[in-house]
Every structure is written in C-alpha cells, then in structure tokens.
C-alpha cells in the first residue's frame, strides 16, 4: 500500500533522497555478505521478561528464523497490506517478526508493552488489523490472555499468535509451528513475497503517537521514509559497518526503530537489545558486549557522571558516541563525557511524524551550543549533516501565521521534506489541521532562532497539550476524558509535573462533586481496572481544587496549574 503522493515520490527520487531499496533488501545483503557475523543479541534478562533462554544469532541464523516466521504467517493467511499488531519487548523475536512481515508486504503496527485493552482495542479497530503477535506474558502481565479478550470485541482480528512457555486457549502457539515449517510452506511464502511486488514506497509501519486528541494517531511510514531517518542517525553518530549497537529504547516508534532497527540494517551491525531499562544491566552490557554506540535519556547520563562509583570497571574504550534527547541536555554532561571518557554526545530532536534535527559534534562542536541548539536545516546553509538539504524548516507566529525571521522570538516549528510523513492514518479531519495551506507540518513545538548568525534553533516549549513521560507521549485530553467518568469527579485537568528522571509525571487537578472525594489509589484503580488504560498513564500526583482556573472564554489555564506545581503551592 502506497500512501505518499506520487509527485512527492518522484521528486525525492529525482533528487537522490529516496531510492528503490527495501528494508528486506538491506537485510538480505548482509545475510549474503556476512552470514557468520553476529547479528542480534537478546537482553540479559530475556528469560525473566518472556521466559525461555536468551539467545544470540548470526545473520545466517537470523535469516533462517525470518524464513520460518514468514512461512508460518503466510500459512495463516497473512499477506500484502494486512495490518498486524505486534506487542513484544526488545527481544530477538521482535526483529524477526518485523522482518518476516516486511518480507510478506504486511503492515506492522507496533504497540508499546504498556498498552492494555483500551489502547489495543482502539488501534486494532482503527487499522482493521487481522492478526496480533505477542508473548504469553511480558514481565508479570498476561499479554496473550489480554489480546484474546480484545479479540472477542474485534471482528477483523482473525489470529492472536503467542510466543512463550504457555499459550492461552484459542490463541496460536507460534513455537511448535516454527519448528515444524517444511519446504512446501517455505516455498509458498517465497512465492507470495515475490508476487506481492513490494516497493520501497509501500507502507512498512503504522506507529502510534499521542497529541491533543483523546485517542492516539497512526503514523504510516514507508521503507524510504524509514531508511532516510536511519541514514540521519548513522550520519550524525558517525557509525560504521560492523559496529555493535545497544538499544534500550522500545522498538515501537521513531526513537527505537530509527536508532536501532533501521541503523542495524543499514550497517550490518550487531544489535544488542535491552528492556526494561535497568541501569546496572545497561552498564554491564556496554562493558561485556563491547558496545560502540547507544542511546540514553539525559537524566541517566547526568546520573552516571554524578555517581562515578557506578562507572567503576566500565571500559568506554569502544564506546564512540551516545545519542540523547527528549529533554534539555546539560552542557556539563556533554563536555564531561567527551573530555573524561572520549565519548561524544549527539543531541536529537525528533518525532514520529518526521521532524529530525541531530545536533552532532561535527556541526556543533561547542558543548554549550550542542546541549541546547539544533542546526537550522533547509535554510540554505551547508551543514555536514546528511539531512541538511532534505528537511526544510520555518518558525511561524501561531497567532498571526507570519514567519519569524528574528532571533529570540518563539514560534511554532513547521517542517516539510523527505523525512516528513504524508498524514495520519485515516484521519482527514486531523490532517487538515496538521498541515498548513502551504503543506508545512505543524509540529506543535515552540522554537526560537538562535546563534550569532541565527544558524540554530532552540526548543522553548510546546503548543500541544501533551505530557512526555519517559519518552512516551500522553494526551492529557484522553486522561481527562477518563477522569470525567469517575463517579466522584465533577471536572479535571491533567498537566505534566517536572521530574528529573522521566522529564514529566502526570498531575491531575480535580474538582470533586459535592460531598464526594477519592484518593490517588482509588483514582488509579478506576483508570487501570475500569478504563483499562496503560499503567504509565496513571496519575502520580493528585491535587484537589475548588474550581479550575479559566480565561474569559472558558479555556482552562493550564499554565497556572503548572505554575502551582512548580511553586509547590497546593491547590
């Protein structure tokens, strides 16, 4: 399925920004050229996460596993343009499932492991997904049984495939089927893949992002749209073939897929997986797996330098660079990692929709600049960054719609170019608001022009009413809608409370009905049990308030609520 307009495809290919190579082409190239090199490594704690024994595979062994998975999925009717929801942690089987579905021309819809029945039911309904792949348990939660419960209310969902030591009734136990694949099944899958005529412009994924709308929005991306994002990562971090990459970010969105999965395929690297985040295990993997590149949140990098005992015995001899972002970086952290350990920090600003601004040492050598500034791409200045002429930016006054050309004045960042998607999945009304009249995508993020020559942009805030907790976008409107259904709640407003580790945590200001109240525990029990929302969307701070502050037209003044949190004044 191709959703990118043909004129865009032709334009980007004529400029040499897009090509005809698919992600499967990249994979098969490495299978041919480096069959016995190590390709992928399970997390140290894989057994605790999903059961079984952690594994490590060569490119040849990975190829055999992909062939078997493709054969089983094809035998159950999965083919071109079918949407398959995948809910798996960062284990080897996740990459294998991705590659098998890519081989068949199916569309992958990755779901965070934190999603529960509410979110899963929505994305299955929205995409018309025909199948789901999960593990019987992920950690302590029974995901196989959960998806079987969703299946009873999802008429399009034909199959739930399950990995693990047990399998719930009615689901399909993948492991014995994978072991029993025969030549006939293998040849049938090969024939189906060939006849599907998969192109680099076909959709690979529909990832999910939360904005101001109550429900998550699907972001479709093609092979070409993923490859150019991966190329930006490889270029910014100066990665080379054969490197060893450590991935602690869930492979469900831009951060996890472009920095790990796609970069791995571009480089023929070794992909070492990590999840859930565990600092001692993370450091152990850097040491034992001889890692060349990884990514981490700013708070983690600050913590390491503030507690050097954590770094005892860790050899940074091979670690060349670390990617970070999603929150402001510390100049001290960027400088210290380089001067003391020889590790360069790359500051990334990006989004599922395709905003991509790497601030790397090649273009921004000053640690103080790199911590807060991003190259102003697409305005004629030549940068070393490969994306410098492939993405275009402008800042616009959100009130007047006039372009901002002077420094120090905040404006909404708008982008277009070869990295930017063409629109949300089956959401024409939202798309009409998401792009302006000239085709620029409205990011909802506020930046200002900076630098002596206005050569940089600096993030200053968000227009969107979104809370970013540990890299996960959470729609405050969604949570407010759920809170409105609580029998004791008259009205509620949800904002982000600053947090040094996660960036933000959820804080709810609640007006209770007369003579009624509820505790934080009761509110969260209602959200997780009655509304079945993901655990990471729970309220972490509850403030009781007599009335929500509003402007003259009735809009809730969330800035005042955030100010109350910052001042420590209870409402």
For the regions a language model picked out, list residue spans one by one.
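N-lobe entry segment of adenylate-forming
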Residues: 1-57, 61-76, 166-168, 192-194, ...
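Conserved pre-ATP/AMP-binding loop-to-beta segment of ANL
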Residues: 35-38, 162, 167-168, 172-175, ...
